[in-house]
Amino acid sequence: RIVNFANELIGKYPHEKIIVSQTDYERNPFYGLNQLPSFISPFSDEFLFEIKFLKTYLNEYLKTSLQLDPRKDNWIYDGLQVYAMMKYMDENHPNTKMMGSVSNLRLLKSYNIANIGFNDQYSYFYMLMARKNLDQALGDPKNTLIKFNEQIASKYRSGLSIRFLDDYLQNDAVPASIKQFYNQNQIKQVSRTDFETILKSNTDKDINWFFNTIINSRAIIDYKFSSVKKTKDSITFSVINKTETPIPIPVYGTKKGAVVFKQWLDIEECDSTFTFPRNGADKIILNLKNEVPEYNLRNNWKKLDGFFPNNRPVKFVFLKDLEDPYYNQVLYVPSIYYNLYDGITPGIRLHNKTILDKPFTFDINPSYSTKSNNLSGLVSFAVNQNYRNSTLYNVKYSVSSSYFHYAQDASYLRINPMVQLRIREPNFRDNRKQLILLRQVIVNKEKSAF
């Protein structure tokens, strides 16, 4: 099935034999599957073998038959491999979750990490680096990429980007272009320029943005609604391009979760006002199915029902979870501390630190001092600001505070404002980094008779 799938999607393999070995897989594993301990088996042995074989076969298939510069055009190898893997999963395992059978546990039903689809994980791995401001342009030479980007983040975003272009162009323009590109490769050595030329010849749409922005730059994508007005029959809304990255974006209308309309907003239309038939929609959403590898999905929703619609309701989650753009997640964890003057201090920690970094985080931990019979605890707030095109790549502003007792009849309040400036070398592979830390510690102590 995998052999036939690759031949139909990409083109007939030109050699008589292809070797697919365990050693090849171990050199280039499927990250996520290979991180699971042996005693956890969320997937059947048959499925694991199928996915491992699919990844390794596609890798060997492309590397031994596609004549590309492995440094300059490595993103094409990666993009075609991941795009093919996602397409294979859509066709053969459309309902498989990222967590496999673990997703069926009732205890985990409320967790986003247990509910996202198998193909959704690619976007999260890319976001892991983008939110840390460590992502790199897909078109950068392979020897300039940091290891995580080379093996995971850039590889996955390459596949997501080709899938995005496929969804935007429609009419099988991308699959047809892949076949033409592969066939042309049998005649001569091909390059990114040939791939670009073939893609442009198969569509009437302007796709210069795909190569100029998606492939050749680190530009991030973030759209949001600025205003929404509704009537019984129509919706009028404005869209803001927050990062000024000229990329088309799809808008959806949904009714009770079912899609009632979808429309692509082209580059020249963004930062504009649109009016669409409502078709009974109770919500409009940008990039609903994450076709566009967007930096921030949390501001893509607008409810149309209710006098004061709550676009993202609060959701309480125990311990930890993956970021869920549908909700304002508050994670809670029971806590317990001890010191001589407060005694045992049970409490509860409330925070919003999901697996992906966020621009604003809070961490509140109220507790009860059993010895002094008073409230105590800790609290912190932080604002994280990334600078995309500077050696000063991150500034973090934070303030934290704690309140406890230092004597049996006296407490202290500590307030700690802080600014951290992180500086890196222009070469991302250079591990040298500098940290400038500005901090003030303010302590207010009650007087003690002891």
Predicted regions: what they are:
Residues 265, 275-276, 287-391, 429-432, ...:
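Outer-membrane beta-barrel initiation region
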Residues 1-76, 80-88, 92, 146, ...:
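Juxtacatalytic substrate-recognition/specificity segment
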Residues 28-32, 51-61, 127-142, 324-326:
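Active-site-adjacent bridging/hinge elements
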Residues 175-177, 210, 331-333, 347, ...:
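Residue-level detector of the transmembrane beta-barrel scaffold of outer-membrane proteins
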Residues 367-450:
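Outer-membrane beta-barrel translocator/channel fold
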Residues 14-15, 142-143, 147-231:
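Amphipathic alpha-helical substructures
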Residues 72, 76-160:
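Acidic/His/Gly-enriched intrinsically disordered linker/tail segments
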Residues 17-18, 174, 207-208, 221-288:
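Beta-strand-rich binding/interaction modules
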